[in-house]
Every structure is written in structure tokens, then in C-alpha cells.
Amino acid sequence: MSLLDWFAERRKQTSLNLTGSSPFDKERQVREIADGLWQKCPACDALTYTKDLQQNWQVCPSCGYHHRITAPQRLQQLLDPGSWQPLDEHLAPTDPLHFFDQKPYAERLASYQERTQLKDAVLTGLGSLEGIPVAMGVMDFRFMGGSMGSVVGEKITRLTERATRDHLPLVIFSASGGARMQEGILSLMQMAKTAAALQRHREAGQLFISVLTHPTYGGVTASFAMLGDLILAEPGAQVGFAGPNVIEQTIGKGKLPEGFQTAEYLLAHGLIDAIVPRTELRRRLAQLLAMHRPRLRMSLPALEPTYALDPARI
């Protein structure tokens, strides 16, 4: 729905009687009508009706820009209705180092927990996708930039071990700035712990699909995010270890290549397997999961590329 269409529809539904109101009252009423109803795309500046954007899973209908979505929204988009069974909901971070930066770590945790209604930066559990049982983990960037502390690492590890034990495929969505500095070495050790659990999952012959979303950096990239048997990414996702500004300042050799660290750049250079738009992700994941279930292979539709690769960028 365009802006002009919305105003035309609004005029049909109701008429605002502003006669006799002061200019301040008129401004307040117009602002109350407009606030939250429209979102401006940071990529193309197009205004999109918020409900239309939500129905399109936060993907700009004008240019395809992928806005960030929350972990609960991701689960709602992907899993069969009513199939989600959360795991390890009781796990919550502590402050063993009594860390203090601009404010105490414990106070910072409480603030993010209240703001996001999450205990930490990942949701893990079991569900089904097009009837196929799956173990799934989804990171939420709203919680301290999706940073990986001891709870995130523990939940990812337990999820992986559960998938290995129950012979389930594993799908993890990454969105993170890296390891959580407030937990020091306890955070860094999660890289080795999650990687070891995934190695056991692989040795058991089970599938792991890693989906990279914007942004995925640091210790998450250096551990489980890049260990998938299949590595997918959303269009435009920024993925790396250190950020481009840090790299430029460190190497001191001018500008980095255009598009460096984007999903498109990684695909062109063989670091990921496919770029899948969010609106097609459920269908594509279902196809990939079914390919690893022999009884379902015969009924699969043809698997076609979902994202064109520009040969000039290779």
C-alpha cells in the first residue's frame, strides 16, 4: 500500500474534525495518526505501511532490503504453527567477574531482559518445518548485540547435543557482534565448546544448516556460524570476524574491495553455499531438510537457484 493509497483509504474510513482546534492540537492529532504506521527503508528511502512490511516479514517491497527481525518473529515465520517446544528456558546469565564498564554488567543484563523479554541472546528448541522435525536455535541481536556469553554458548551446545541424541537436523540462525566482553574467558571458551559439540553432531552423520543474518561477526563467525554442512545467508548480510573499519585501520593499505564482507561477496568467493531471501527461506529450508530424509526425496520439486550470481564479482 502506497502513502497516497493509505490516505485515500483513511479518508473513506473516518474524517477528522479539526474545526476549532488550535494548531498545536492539529499537529498532535496528525502525529498520533502517523507515528508507527509507516517505516522508511534505510536502503531506498521508500515509505512502507508497517502492516505491509510485517506481512512481508520485514523485507522492503520496493528494494528487497531485509530489516532485522526478532527471534520470536523468526520462529513464527519458519516453524509449523504450534510445533515450537523451547529448551533450557531457565538458563540465565550471571556476573561471575563483577564486571563494570559504564554501569555494572548485572544492571545491564536486567535492562536488556526487561526491554526484550528474553533471558539472553538466543532461543533454542524443537519444532517442525513442513512436518519435518528439526532442532532450531535463533539469535536475537536486540539482546546486547547478540553477543555470545556463557548462556548462549551453553544453550547452543545443549541444543546440538539434543539434536545428535535424537537424530535431528540442526538449524541455527546467527546474528551477533561476537563474544561478550563482560564475561571474559568464560565467553571465549564457548567458541571451542560449541565447535566440539558440532563435530560430534557431524560424526554422528547428522545435518547442520547455518543461516547467517545481518550482522554476524567475531567469535560467533569464528565458531559455530561457519561450521555448517550448508551455509546460507540472507541478502545483504554483513559477515566477518573484525569489522571493515578495523581491518582498514589495521592493514593501512587503503580501501577494501567493494561489497567486502557482504553475503554476495562471500558467495562469489566460495565461503557460503547460497543466498536465500527471507520470503523464500521456509520453502528452501524444507527442501534441504527433505533432501536428507530418503523417504521424502522422490516428492521434491526441482531445487532452483534463488539468487543470481554476478560473474564479474568472482
From Swiss-Prot:
For this UniProt entry, the molecular function terms from Gene Ontology, in alphabetical order, are: acetyl-CoA carboxylase activity; ATP binding; carboxyl- or carbamoyltransferase activity; zinc ion binding
Q: Where in the cell is it found?
A: Cytoplasm
Q: In which pathway does it act?
A: Lipid metabolism; malonyl-CoA biosynthesis; malonyl-CoA from acetyl-CoA: step 1/1
Positions that bind Zn(2+): 41, 44, 60, 63
What GO biological process term is on the record, naming one?
malonyl-CoA biosynthetic process
Protein's name according to its UniProt entry = Acetyl-coenzyme A carboxylase carboxyl transferase subunit beta
Give the family per the record: Belongs to the AccD/PCCB family.
Could you tell me what this protein does?
Component of the acetyl coenzyme A carboxylase (ACC) complex. Biotin carboxylase (BC) catalyzes the carboxylation of biotin on its carrier protein (BCCP) and then the CO(2) group is transferred by the transcarboxylase to acetyl-CoA to form malonyl-CoA.
The alphabetized UniProt keywords are: ATP-binding, Cytoplasm, Fatty acid biosynthesis, Fatty acid metabolism, Lipid biosynthesis, Lipid metabolism, Metal-binding, Nucleotide-binding, Transferase, Zinc, Zinc-finger
Quaternary structure and partners? Acetyl-CoA carboxylase is a heterohexamer composed of biotin carboxyl carrier protein (AccB), biotin carboxylase (AccC) and two subunits each of ACCase subunit alpha (AccA) and ACCase subunit beta (AccD).
Every copy of the CoA carboxyltransferase N-terminal domain together lies at: 37-307
EC top class, as a word: transferase
What EC numbers are recorded for this enzyme? 2.1.3.15
The terms describing its cellular component in GO are: acetyl-CoA carboxylase complex
The record's free-text note on cofactor binding: Binds 1 zinc ion per subunit.
- Note the zinc finger regions (C4-type) by start and end residue: 41-63
Note the Pfam families from the entry.
Carboxyl_trans, Zn_ribbon_ACC
User: What InterPro entries would the database entry show?
Assistant: AcCoA_carboxyl_beta, Acetyl_CoA_COase_Trfase_b_su, ClpP/crotonase-like_dom_sf, COA_CT_N, Znf-ACC
What are the names of the required cofactors? Zn(2+)
Q: Does the keyword Protein biosynthesis apply?
A: no
SUPFAM superfamilies xref list: ClpP/crotonase
The reply to whether Transmembrane figures as a keyword in the UniProt entry is no
